[in-house]
């Protein structure tokens, strides 16, 4: 606080006048102010402090008040050091330079209610546990989100690896019938991609037997399904569909 009368610092939220006419400085303005957080001074001049505040102090009650009207009671238990406990907040709107008259009616705008310390401690512990649980859940959610992102990435990669863009000459199937090799191949016919059945006549020569399926999105052949991926038309292989095909369907020319 420094030297000189502290009264020159009035008004200041941290400066109080007590029942002994001393000035008390609070480092903190909490409901309980322990001895390590307040110091006092016997001033030589109280003229900067309005007489109404000085006259408010009752010498029979250990108390102090600041310019805001915050009233603290000085408490001393046998087993504890002295401390100040906030009692409430007085309406000081009618406090002036003169002493308060004996019949002045004091009005409290707020009375401080202290709670049980053990309950406060339990509440703090519960809040701490709650925060720890929240943090744990947040960490787990973050971890799950990372796993989810990785799974989506792997799924996308798997889908990409199972996707082949349709192009002229793409072979989807080979078979051997009566000693002759047959194949199902993609051909571009009149600007349309079609599934064409071809037979090997001699060596590298293939003869077209017929164009059967227009390869557009949704078309199916054996385990192949025509799909669109990133704006491109292609095929992916569906092993589940292939395994579910019955004999009658397989005997058909195109499935």
Curated annotation (Swiss-Prot):
Keywords: Virion. One of its GO terms (cellular component) is virion component. It is found in: Virion. The keyword Disulfide bond does not apply. The keyword Oxidoreductase does not apply. InterPro entries: Tobravirus_2B (IPR007935). Pfam families: Tobravirus_2B. Belongs to the tobravirus protein 2b family. The genome of this virus consists of two linear, positive, single-stranded RNAs encapsidated in separate virions. They are designated RNA-1 and RNA-2. May function by interacting with a small, flexible domain located at the C-terminus of the CP, forming a bridge between the virus particle and the internal surface of the vector nematode feeding apparatus. This is Protein 2b. It comes from Tobacco rattle virus (strain TCM).
């Amino acid at each position: 606080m420094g030297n000189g009368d502290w009264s020159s610092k009035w008004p200041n939220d941290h400066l109080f006048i007590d029942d002994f006419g001393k000035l008390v400085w609070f480092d903190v303005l909490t409901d309980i102010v322990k001895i390590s957080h307040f110091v006092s001074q016997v001033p030589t001049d109280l003229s900067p402090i309005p007489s109404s505040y000085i006259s408010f102090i009752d010498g029979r009650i250990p108390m102090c008040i600041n310019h805001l009207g915050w009233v603290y009671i000085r408490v001393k238990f046998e087993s504890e050091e002295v401390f100040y406990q906030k009692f409430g907040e007085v309406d000081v709107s009618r406090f002036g330079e003169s002493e308060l008259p004996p019949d002045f009616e004091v009005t409290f705008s707020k009375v401080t209610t202290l709670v049980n310390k053990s309950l406060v401690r339990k509440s703090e512990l519960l809040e701490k546990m709650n925060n720890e649980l929240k943090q744990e859940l947040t960490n787990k959610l973050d971890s799950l989100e990372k796993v989810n992102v990785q799974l989506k990435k792997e799924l996308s990669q798997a889908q990409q690896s199972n996707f082949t863009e349709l192009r002229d000459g793409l072979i989807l199937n080979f078979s051997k019938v009566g000693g002759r090799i047959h194949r199902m191949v993609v051909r571009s016919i009149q600007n349309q991609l079609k599934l064409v059945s071809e037979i090997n006549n001699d060596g590298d020569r293939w003869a077209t037997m017929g164009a059967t399926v227009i390869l557009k999105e949704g078309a199916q052949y054996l385990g192949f399904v025509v799909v669109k991926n990133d704006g491109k038309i292609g095929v992916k292989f569906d092993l589940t569909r292939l395994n579910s095909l019955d004999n009658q369907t397989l005997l058909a020319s195109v499935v």
